[in-house]
């Protein structure tokens, strides 16, 4: 979470970032704490590559008023707030066209970078970080025919908070990279699209995504 927060803080300054993994998987943080000095040597020798990672921007609307807006490197999650056994309804649109509606605990809209995070744990696909697409993954949907859907990066996704099965006012929130949260209520909608800014990530080991994926998965 530290690297995600830092990415949102520095993205407008176009400062390349280098992550040091002190946790578990760490797909973004390719350097572990035992390799810090080796990493510094490579930096000083200009032995690195810079990889661009797309971000999402989300705008929450209540009627014709904006109630919140932010960017995310990993994902934007729209989820319920309240009793743990209550699901809420979601109405989903793509480029102003109706897609589907279902009851669930939430919905994840993830970038290729975020596809190895929360979306993956909810059954979403792993997407190569240089792929030009986003993925929508439901969280515990109450239907058998709802699965992750991949969209081109330029598609605009709108998620509207519905009434759910109880047909009462529901409360939810939109979370940006698990950090900034914007409250939502029935009828509110969030419009999500590719951000005009991107994050620059330093790569030192020159490994392909497939090689990194194999290493991370074999160690966990």
PLM region spans:
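Short, well-ordered alpha-helical microsegments
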Residues: 3-4, 144
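Short Gly/Thr/Asp-enriched flexible loops that form oxyanion-binding sites at enzyme active sites
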Residues: 5-12, 119-123
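A generic structural signal for short beta-strands and their flanking turns/coil linkers
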Residues: 52-56, 72-74, 86-90, 105-107, ...
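Gly/Ser/Thr-rich active-site loops/lids in small-molecule metabolic enzymes
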Residues: 97-104, 109-145
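Short glycine-rich anion-binding loops that position phosphate/pyrophosphate groups of nucleotides
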Residues: 1-2, 25, 113-115
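ATP/nucleoside-binding phosphotransfer catalytic cores, i.e., glycine-rich phosphate-binding loops
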Residues: 78-79, 89, 94-98, 147-220
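Catalytic core of DAGKc-family lipid kinases
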Residues: 25-105
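Short, acidic/small-residue loops that bind anionic groups at enzyme active sites
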Residues: 13-31
């Amino acid at each position: 979470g530290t690297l995600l927060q830092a990415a949102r803080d520095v993205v407008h300054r176009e400062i390349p970032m280098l992550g040091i993994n002190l946790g578990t998987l760490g797909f973004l943080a390719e350097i572990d704490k035992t390799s810090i000095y080796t990493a510094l040597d490579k930096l000083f020798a200009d032995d690195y590559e810079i990889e661009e990672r797309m971000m999402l921007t989300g705008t929450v609307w209540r009627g014709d008023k904006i109630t919140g807006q932010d960017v995310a490197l990993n994902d934007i999650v729209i989820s319920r707030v309240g009793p743990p056994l209550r699901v809420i309804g979601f109405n989903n649109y793509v480029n102003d066209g109706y897609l589907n509606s279902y009851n669930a605990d939430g919905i994840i809209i993830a970038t290729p970078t975020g596809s190895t995070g929360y979306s993956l744990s909810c059954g979403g696909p792993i997407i190569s970080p240089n792929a030009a697409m986003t993925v929508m993954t439901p969280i515990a949907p109450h239907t058998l025919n709802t699965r992750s859907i991949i969209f081109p990066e330029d598609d605009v996704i709108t998620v509207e908070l519905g009434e759910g099965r109880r047909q009462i006012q529901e409360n939810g929130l939109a979370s940006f990279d698990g950090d900034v949260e914007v409250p939502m209520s029935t009828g509110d909608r969030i419009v999500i699209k590719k951000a005009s800014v991107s994050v620059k990530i330093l790569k030192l080991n020159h490994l392909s995504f497939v090689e990194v994926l194999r290493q991370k998965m074999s160690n966990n």
